[in-house]
Amino acid sequence: MNCVCRLVLVVLSLWPDRVVAPGPPAGSPRVSSDPRADLDSAVLLTRSLLADTRQLAAQMRDKFPADGDHSLDSLPTLAMSAGTLGSLQLPGVLTRLRVDLMSYLRHVQWLRRAGGPSLKTLEPELGALQARLERLLRRLQLLMSRLALPQAAPDQPVIPLGPPASAWGSIRAAHAILGGLHLTLDWAVRGLLLLKTRL
């Protein structure tokens, strides 16, 4: 009996492809088929980034008080207002949000690189902010892929950002970047929550 079993095992080993059923490809992730779940994840990441931005903006005001509005011509303009919420469409919102956040990511990277000694004390917070921005952008890209939406390019060519003219210039730039990002994320949370009800 043992000889027969061994003989069978030897014969089977000669044709492994016919005996072993192929399994799923290695490393194939589970893909969610529910866009509402993907949108929920994007909303949570956006809210978390909004809270981080609000906290960092408050730190900036404490460390470097600066009255008045601050702006940078290179920052994107806020595309939507409260009056336009009712007419929002998911493709336009996701496309514009991704383009705007890519611009803010570039500005945060620039701030970390060229902000000078004054902003070095905020380097850990700026690094964490950049990491969360990158994570949210990956989530938005995934959501757009699941919904078969085009990956839009920026409306205008990217212009390299020059170094701030002075230490005060870098501080004003930081106020402008954080303030603009805060407004963009606040609008994004409202818009995404509204659009979720239409899926």
From Swiss-Prot:
Belongs to the IL-6 superfamily. Changing residue 190 to A: Srongly reduces IL11RA binding and stimulation of cell proliferation. Keywords: Cytokine, Growth factor, Secreted, Signal. One of its GO terms (cellular component) is cytoplasm. InterPro entries: 4_helix_cytokine-like_core, IL-11, IL-11_mml. Residues 1-21 form the signal peptide. Coiled coil: none annotated. Its main location: secreted. Interacts with either IL11RA1 or IL11RA2 to associate with IL6ST, giving rise to a multimeric signaling complex. Induction: Up-regulated in hepatocytes by oxidative stress caused by liver damage. One of its GO terms (biological process) is negative regulation of hormone secretion. The gene is Il11. Residues 182-190 are annotated as: Important for interaction with IL11RA and for the stimulation of cell proliferation. This is Interleukin-11. It holds the Pfam family IL11. It is found in: Secreted. Cytokine that stimulates the proliferation of hematopoietic stem cells and megakaryocyte progenitor cells and induces megakaryocyte maturation resulting in increased platelet production. Also promotes the proliferation of hepatocytes in response to liver damage. Binding to its receptor formed by IL6ST and either IL11RA1 or IL11RA2 activates a signaling cascade that promotes cell proliferation, also in the context of various cancers. Signaling leads to the activation of intracellular protein kinases and the phosphorylation of STAT3. GO terms for molecular function: cytokine activity; growth factor activity; interleukin-11 receptor binding.
